[in-house]
Amino acid sequence: FNKLEPLDEGELKDRLMTLADKAGFRAKTIEVMDGSKRSGHSNAFFTGFGGFRRIVLYDTLIEQMEPEELEAVLAHEIGHYKCGHVPKRLALSALFGLVGFWLIAHLTQSSWFCGHLGFATDAQDRLGPVFLVLSVAAGVFTFWLAPFGSLLSRKHEFEADAFARDMMCGPDPLISSLRKLH
């Protein structure tokens, strides 16, 4: 779908790799994604883990920003890694998944719950209807939980911004890059 090419050798690559090393972020490569073929949207991210970690920059990002601004964007992305945001979000998703499975198991066995909804008396025959009810109810729960997810997301973004500010010895490159992103 998207093509990834290694970032050309030169000053930009040297600056970005130096920043990553300074932050203690080991990346195998820096790659450029051909995002301009589908959109004018700009982005940067890291993918992989251990010795297979890669930094990916959209070609649009490289075209729109000065090297110092690109460093600030990369510092922000590294901030997500250093602050442990990915494992925290994965753990939260796993927790919600476990709660969902627990509810399915518990409510499938509940004669009171199933009886009030007119479901079968045999526990094996209740799984489908209970799953259907919980699937519909999940939409209601996620509607009410969405503000908390947004709050957590904003908290993580502010933490990554603070990390980038500290890495860049001030807020100006980050502010400038964020203005160009939006």
Where are these regions (language model features)?
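Polar-ligand-bearing catalytic/cofactor-coordination segments
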Residues: 1-125, 139-182
